[in-house]
Amino acid sequence: MERVGMNGAEIIDGKAYAAGLRARVATAVPAFRVAAGRAPGLAVVLVGEDAASQVYVRSKHKATVEAGMESFEHRLPATASETELLALVERLNADDRVDGILVQLPLPPHIDEKKVIATIDPDKDVDGFHVVNAGRLAVGEAGYVPCTPLGCLMLLKDRRGDLSGLEAVVIGRSNIVGKPMAALLLAENCTVTIAHSRTRDLAEVVRRADIVVAAVGRPEMVRGDWIRPGATVIDVGINRVPGAEPGKTRLVGDVAFAEAAAVAGAITPVPGGVGPMTIAVLLRNTLVAAHRRAGVALPEGAIG
């Protein structure tokens, strides 16, 4: 267990946990192949030449293949029409080899992201963005949960065990992280507060939390004196800021790490905390989708 300083916070190693989850997924794939006569399949669609998106798509392809799954990569030019993209999604919906469909965001401005997400078959929506899956999460039914908040919950439960009765503050209310994160914590019987840009005296709200999840996209906004001693801090932010050398940059989270680590009981670093969990949970969701679609039981506790 790594700590910051003599009495500082435990560092939550998301990279190590993600590696373990990916290994468990890979271990479960051969049994599915035998039962279903095929490998689980993940289709990733990229529109345009966005550099960051290309990196993410390559990482997802590599991880999918390493897990023993089929990776179906579809690239469209930035000039592709919305109609072309929707037609591709419909073809993937109908393709029995494909268990999960992921359309890499952001999309070019002439394409309606909401319409594209709504076209994905909810049972193949391994990103958990479809309104049907959002509704399933809200009412406690089985569906697909967005990868980042589910990864955060896994790290929290691994660190703290039973979360029942704990005070949790989620900073940020996006559909991708904040809202589903709050729903997951509520399902774990936490007392949940969602904070945002209009929250009055945000620092005071955060100070009462046993669990802080920061997902606002503002570099080092959450200061150390906001953190309750012993709290668990999950930093979802990934922000690029100027580095020490001219022309260089570095990655920081939404939490002032050194300050918070001096007070918290445990904290995720940036990088190496939440980030690696996202692709690992994507593989997990794809494996679950494959089992559900094929009518094959996934042994309880096999992948977490």
Curated annotation (Swiss-Prot):
Record SUPFAM superfamilies: Aminoacid dehydrogenase-like, N-terminal domain, NAD(P)-binding Rossmann-fold domains
Binding residue positions for NADP(+): 172-174, 197, 238
Record text on subunit structure and interactions: Homodimer.
GO cellular component: cytosol
UniProt superkingdom: Bacteria
GO molecular function, one term: methylenetetrahydrofolate dehydrogenase (NADP+) activity
Catalysed conversion reaction: (6R)-5,10-methylene-5,6,7,8-tetrahydrofolate + NADP(+) = (6R)-5,10-methenyltetrahydrofolate + NADPH; (6R)-5,10-methenyltetrahydrofolate + H2O = (6R)-10-formyltetrahydrofolate + H(+)
Coiled coil stretches, renumbered: none
InterPro entries xref list: Aminoacid_DH-like_N_sf, NAD(P)-bd_dom_sf, THF_DH/CycHdrlase, THF_DH/CycHdrlase_cat_dom, THF_DH/CycHdrlase_CS, THF_DH/CycHdrlase_NAD-bd_dom
EC code(s) of this entry: 1.5.1.5, 3.5.4.9
Identification of the protein by name: Bifunctional protein FolD 3
Key words of the record: Amino-acid biosynthesis, Histidine biosynthesis, Hydrolase, Methionine biosynthesis, Multifunctional enzyme, NADP, One-carbon metabolism, Oxidoreductase, Purine biosynthesis
Originating organism: Rhizorhabdus wittichii (strain DSM 6014 / CCUG 31198 / JCM 15750 / NBRC 105917 / EY 4224 / RW1)
Role of this protein: Catalyzes the oxidation of 5,10-methylenetetrahydrofolate to 5,10-methenyltetrahydrofolate and then the hydrolysis of 5,10-methenyltetrahydrofolate to 10-formyltetrahydrofolate.
Pathway assigned in UniProt: One-carbon metabolism; tetrahydrofolate interconversion
Protein family membership: Belongs to the tetrahydrofolate dehydrogenase/cyclohydrolase family.
Keyword Hydrolase: yes
Cytoplasm among keywords: no
